[in-house]
């Protein structure tokens, strides 16, 4: 499975309907909302901008290197303000960003780091898989990607509790202990819901 491929714990990852859904979930997990800014490379897919705008935050575009089309800590640092809450980076075309300097910059400024691995499903940086180095990582498995399954995605969270929340919210807000997950002698037709949710599980 992908957790094994990424050399991470199964409890740190969850399949989702698409990479864009992972970015929407990331905004919610990190409590990003109105008045916040999220720095994002000027070369990126519209789904990431939609995720930022949908929660009321403002996307702030930073420049990229002309040879790799990846952003750098220098370009990110230029855009940091007191409103900045997170940074989304894209590992473009399988080439990882310089994560040492970007991770250091984010820690110095108390910023969350989201890695978009839509173009780099199994890329590594100094022996570690990209997407598992920041706070959150997202992958795409749609029909135009290197790993294809029609449509689908994966999300990694450093905090395993975040994955539990995603599992619940991606299946209509149902608690895992309710409904079809329990045996027939325990009222399988009863469902427990304690929050709103969407149906964004993988098909």
Annotate each language-model stretch with its function.
Residues 1-37, 51-53, 61-63, 128:
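Phosphate-binding glycine-rich loop
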Residues 9, 34, 83, 132-133, ...:
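Short loop/turn motifs at secondary-structure junctions
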Residues 28-117, 121-124:
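PLP-dependent aminotransferase-like
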Residues 120-126, 133-203:
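Active-site region of PLP-dependent enzymes
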